Amino acid sequence: MTNYHFTGIKGSGMSALAQILHDLNENVQGSDIEETIFTQKPLERKGITLLPFSRDNIKNGQHVIVSAAYGETHEEIKRARELGLKVDVYPEFLGSFIKQFTSIAVSGSHGKTSTTGLLAHVLGSVEPTSYLIGDGTGKGAANSTYFVFEACEYRRHFLNYSPDYCVMTNIDFDHPDYFKSVEDVVSAFQTMAKQVNKAIIACGDDEHLQTLQANVPIVYYGLGDHNDFQAKSIKNTPEGTAFDAWVRGDLFGSFVIPGFGDHNVKNALSVIALCHYEGIGYEDIVEHLKTFAGVKRRFSEKRSGKQILIDDYAHHPTEIAATIEATKKKYHDREVTAIFQPHTFTRTKTFLNEFAEALSQADHVYLCDIFGSAREEQGSLSIEQLQALVDGAKLLTEAEIETLKGHGESVLLFMGAGDIQKYQKAYEALIESSS
């Protein structure tokens, strides 16, 4: 049994990995900032000790795993070096850890978390499966056949992995604080493709993924006729979305998923393709696709009086457009009111016009102040510059949250990767106190 200490345990990947090792009967503790973050709840439920950052947390006999957000200057890492302890950065540790399983990385600019969750759900219903999801959820199953994990392209972290399979959902220009252009992103995915050992499952509707070269088979999925796995006859139903899956021109079968929007159909199709490649039966895939309950902060819904409140992690124009589209398909008889908090000044500046175009698909738009990341506390851009590009957009603060009550039976769509949840919580508290 190993004694693990996680420096930065509340990060989504770190939290999930800590849960996995705990499930596998290792001793796990961790430290982080004292602010409450949604990823810590599952840690607390499992009885994993959470500490504030301190060099005193580091003891002899520990194996220290450090978040990629922290470097050698962190007080805990300095102490670990003084004691001569084994220290691994999260992506490096994960890259080594996955070698004991049939490993399946899920990568892509958008849709990673939802696809990882869906694939883990389907595989885990058929075979022992461990998984690490980007919403902070992790599970370690004894004697696992599969390990499904989210592999992020940021700073090329996913190049620490050489998985058996890699699902690639799409390539888009994001993380402009690191990537220079979409070509730079493509280059990272091309390098990743060369590291895959068995097969790549890639969205063939994405022009960038069509250019991939690899030493293993590439199985393409999507809505276009050129794909190996194609979705046809897509229809909205009371249960979600129904579609037929065709494999190289032959009907494989009909499926229903709880989600809405073409992006969710494609995510499901990638899971179907992977399962088909692994020899998992049609009936198992059908049964477990339709029972997927979703992942945290991805189209998470609740009712509040006559309104529908949705919390979503969307923080890139492509994701915002897809989330608004899915909302309109599911709630076609309601107005959609978007409440958006931009995440990082760099991303907001880079995609200012694209954000405006995506948000304009909503019936009403409210904008919250830009959330700066730990890497950039402030920037020269103001939220008013985005407001000027979106007709009728209004600014929103927590103190003015009561304004949302004026939207009757609207769907209130809270979107962002920062702390947009505090606005929704403030609104829910207001509704509860006035009921």
UniProtKB/Swiss-Prot annotation:
Coiled coil: none annotated. Its EC number is 6.3.2.8. It catalyses: UDP-N-acetyl-alpha-D-muramate + L-alanine + ATP = UDP-N-acetyl-alpha-D-muramoyl-L-alanine + ADP + phosphate + H(+). Gene3D superfamilies: Mur ligase, C-terminal domain (3.90.190.20), Mur-like, catalytic domain (3.40.1190.10), NAD(P)-binding Rossmann-like Domain (3.40.50.720). Keywords: ATP-binding, Cell cycle, Cell division, Cell shape, Cell wall biogenesis/degradation, Cytoplasm, Ligase, Nucleotide-binding, Peptidoglycan synthesis. Pathway: Cell wall biogenesis; peptidoglycan biosynthesis. It is found in: Cytoplasm. GO terms for biological process: cell division; cell wall organization; peptidoglycan biosynthetic process; regulation of cell shape. Belongs to the MurCDEF family. Cell wall formation. This is UDP-N-acetylmuramate--L-alanine ligase.
